[in-house]
Amino acid sequence: MANTASAKKMTRKIAKRTAINRSRRSRMRTFVRKVEEAIASGNQQDALAALRAAEPEMMRAAQHGIVHKNNASRKVSRLAARVKALAA
């Protein structure tokens, strides 16, 4: 339990920040799931549209420190490769 006023304030700030981070992470995962569902359905047009929507969302999460920049880039790259493979 926080004893000082500043510690209590930090507890409030951390709770607020945690909620924001949780929301951003969830939003990113939702976009990734939509891409994976489109890939599973085999429709390249839908998968490409979903990927184009997901990429900025993933990079935004990386910018805010939700995931590491390299992690987001790797996921985008792997999803793009899977979408490209649908055309073949």
UniProtKB/Swiss-Prot annotation:
Family the entry assigns: Belongs to the bacterial ribosomal protein bS20 family.
Name this protein carries in UniProt: Small ribosomal subunit protein bS20
Gene Ontology molecular function: any one: small ribosomal subunit rRNA binding
GO CC, alphabetical: cytosol; small ribosomal subunit
Native organism: Methylobacterium radiotolerans (strain ATCC 27329 / DSM 1819 / JCM 2831 / NBRC 15690 / NCIMB 10815 / 0-1)
Domain of life: Bacteria
Function noted in UniProt: Binds directly to 16S ribosomal RNA.
Pfam families assigned to the protein according to its UniProt record, in alphabetical order: Ribosomal_S20p (PF01649)
UniProt entry keywords in alphabetical sequence: Ribonucleoprotein, Ribosomal protein, RNA-binding, rRNA-binding
Organismal lineage: Bacteria, Pseudomonadati, Pseudomonadota, Alphaproteobacteria, Hyphomicrobiales
Stretch list, region Disordered: 1-27
PANTHER family: 30S RIBOSOMAL PROTEIN S20, SMALL RIBOSOMAL SUBUNIT PROTEIN BS20C
Entry annotated with the keyword Ribosomal protein: yes
GO biological process, one term: translation
